[in-house]
């Protein structure tokens, strides 16, 4: 009887996990913006961070101590109502190409911006670790905060206002325009 209950509980957890993952995938669809040939922004919010923490706890089974560590790591990536927060990833499968590209993109995290109504809002990298090493090679993952003033938020919420995301880096001068679907999803981060 005990084993049967345990199996039922495990099945229930697996079913709930599947449902949550399905929700997260659907929600992330309009929180993703590609930039150039190698990078993507994944805009974070409470729901994406909660799902990430739950997934880490499920996989690693670290208990309360791990929960504290995960909360400490991921809470800063939840937007505070006056910012957008993104994980900026360089996704390059070929290791030789990846090393070459990342070696040419030192400090890209400091040259990344969102442009709203002609005003550039430069990213503020998360303070956890330096993302560019002494040789000038950048990390493939960056955690970025875009801190908005009230007038930027107002303009961002105007669906007729063009919003761009890009970098001023000399080796990666790319710009993408946010679709209205993406803007609609991200507007909720200002509430």
PLM feature segments, named:
Residues 178-191:
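Protruding loop/beta-arch "assembly-hinge" segments enriched in small, turn-prone residues
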Residues 44-85:
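A glycine-rich, hydrophobic loop/mini-helix early in the fold
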Residues 1-13:
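Single conserved hydrophobic/aromatic residue that forms the stacking wall/gate
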Residues 23-26, 65-76, 121-131:
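Short amphipathic beta-strand starts and helix->beta connectors
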Residues 78, 82, 87-155, 159:
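Long, charge-patterned amphipathic alpha-helical coiled-coil/hairpin "stalk" segments used as oligomerization
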Residues 149-177, 181:
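Mixed-charge, glycine-accented linear interaction segment located at domain edges/termini
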């Amino acid at each position: 009887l005990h084993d049967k209950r345990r199996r039922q509980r495990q099945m229930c957890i697996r079913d709930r996990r599947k449902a949550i993952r399905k929700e997260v995938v659907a929600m992330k669809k309009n929180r993703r913006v590609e930039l150039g040939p190698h990078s993507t922004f994944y805009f974070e919010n409470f729901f994406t961070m909660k799902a990430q923490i739950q997934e880490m706890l499920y996989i690693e089974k670290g208990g309360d101590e791990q929960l504290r560590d995960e909360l400490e790591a991921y809470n800063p990536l939840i937007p505070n109502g006056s910012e957008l927060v993104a994980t900026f990833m360089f996704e390059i499968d070929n290791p030789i190409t990846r090393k070459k590209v990342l070696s040419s993109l030192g400090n890209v995290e400091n040259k990344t911006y969102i442009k709203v109504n002609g005003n550039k809002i430069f990213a503020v990298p998360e303070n956890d670790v330096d993302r560019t090493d002494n040789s000038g090679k950048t990390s493939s993952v960056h955690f970025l905060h875009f801190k908005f003033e009230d007038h930027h938020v107002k303009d961002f919420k105007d669906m007729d206002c063009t919003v761009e995301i890009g970098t001023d880096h000399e080796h990666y001068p790319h710009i993408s325009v946010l679709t209205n679907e993406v803007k609609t999803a991200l507007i909720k981060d200002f509430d």
